């Protein structure tokens, strides 16, 4: 259809669609949001809606009353949605030569959700913007639902990718130039994350524009006061992000907080591969399962506390003071079970203060949201009241600032609002009768009109002395007072004559006219009044915005500590000694996840003792299924928990702070990059060798197994030697291996110690002890594991026959020769 033949309404649609770009446009038409052309086809396909046609144009629609649920479904499928609203009211009984006005008013994308069911309650929903200037990558990260705004720079792609994967955004923004030049970065991110890619103009990433955008938003003349001096690529990314949100997506940005630089100097770095291998946030083979460390540790009562726990789990502290402050606070609550019970009771009543405040700031709050804010403030102040009189540890001191402003706000909200509040302002019944003088009168008029008329009739009868006076109603006159003609002269002058009849006179009064006016428009008046009162109340809330956000952080801290204390109490955890020493000593350590999955008392505790001047590397041999991998993962998890400030499942522990944790555990083909299992293994190992330090913890499981025996052994030993003898790379290393030849290293290097997964034989069958014992393993029992896996018995028998041949005298002689060759490598 040419533009000349387009109806006025379709011309509006085309204008909005041009502005919407790649987004799916929902166009308000009366009681429906309609989609046209390709958008209609997509809407029909993905939401199972009927596809129709009008004048050959495909169209599909969604009822206005159900729009939010359908938008959520579209966004969950990766769509960006644009919404064009109808600005005019339909005029009843009047034709219009011009179409109703419409304009594009909002966009919804995966990274800009505010009040969607898709928002994870206890996780951030980030949108990330990336830019590069010279050798530096800059990125800005925003949780639009809370206003949290972070900036950082990196000098290499690996650290950039690891940090973005740690944050797990749902949307990434950059310019075409970046996407084309650094497609490898995007490919790697897409392997780990479910992402929507968004593109914005190159000019928005220019430094002058970005600086001006940020300065204007935060109302400053310089960004140096925010600690951003010299962070050119990060500033470029941040300014472009704000412009994208405000200028392209038409979103409010008033709630976005002053940006913070998100450095890693105070945090234990756990790279992306290690987060996955250690199953910190989700199980490897069951993303919805319960075998992650997060699931085990999660005891938080509030969304803010849950997000803090999740963030700290993937970025534990590398700062002794921060760790000790939290340990002291955990111990304080651990020893007070009744206090913990009371805190849980109050914290469970606190809703998402950050996101509620954002919805108020962006004028998207519902009455129900404000009611939840009121109830959350009340419960939060009760938390303060419970804790404030106590001899608090340092972590809590200074957090419970005077809450006079918030107490006043709470008092206002409590007096203003009814108990149960609606989702929409249009539903009414938001404010208490006493909050505004007109509320009571209008509601009384609406709900008690008959009683009011009867009372008014009796009142004026008494005032006038005319007992036969009646208050009546007609379609033509509305409400009126009727008396017989002979009694009319008895009425006061303020009675206004309306109509004369043959034997009667009809009057009205100002009060009756006011009642009639109220009755005719009472619902509209009530809605208008409550709408204005609600806007005013939200503005009063915003006066305390910063105080509410500070309160939110305090509640998150209390909830985090309470969660760790409850965890320690439930499982009888110990307080580890965490300091700057080179020690890693754990007595009776237990895998925190396995402990919860197995019956109490069935998990076998194990020890570890390492020190940079003594044992720096432990080689662990033994059969599969005997517990090697569980043990080495366990050590890493206990270190992470300890540096979160948590107590840990052990009898005792002394942990010198670790700066980085690396793992090389298992692998799979990466077909998208043309990488075999062995290539993935080698790439991950190379990353460890390049980035490990003397204070790192390295977990290696079967390095070198993906190639021939000689190649694999040579690679494994060279990796061991590199980590043992290279200055600056002498990390504490746990190396699980089937290469028995490596165990001879213990004889030649005092920093290497052999351990094995214990096995006893009973009637020729192995019994796994799940203990890690001193010395190396004598047998692998691989054929027995094959039998347990269901190999045909004939295959098992043949394997045993071949094994006996290989273990004969000639094989033994050959193995001795190989050992001599192996030692020369060392």
UniProtKB/Swiss-Prot annotation:
UniProt keyword annotation of rRNA processing present: no
Function: This protein is involved in the repair of mismatches in DNA. It is possible that it carries out the mismatch recognition step. This protein has a weak ATPase activity.
GO cellular component: cytosol
UniProt binding sites for ATP: 622-629
InterPro entries: DNA_mismatch_repair_MutS, DNA_mismatch_repair_MutS-lik_N, DNA_mismatch_repair_MutS/MSH, DNA_mismatch_repair_MutS_C, DNA_mismatch_repair_MutS_clamp, DNA_mismatch_repair_MutS_core, DNA_mismatch_repair_MutS_N, DNA_mismatch_repair_MutS_sf
Biological processes, Gene Ontology terms: mismatch repair
Source organism, top-level taxon: Bacteria
SUPFAM superfamilies tied to this protein: DNA repair protein MutS, domain I, DNA repair protein MutS, domain II, DNA repair protein MutS, domain III, P-loop containing nucleoside triphosphate hydrolases
Family: Belongs to the DNA mismatch repair MutS family.
Protein name: DNA mismatch repair protein MutS
One GO MF term attached to the UniProt entry: ATP binding
Keywords: ATP-binding, DNA damage, DNA repair, DNA-binding, Nucleotide-binding
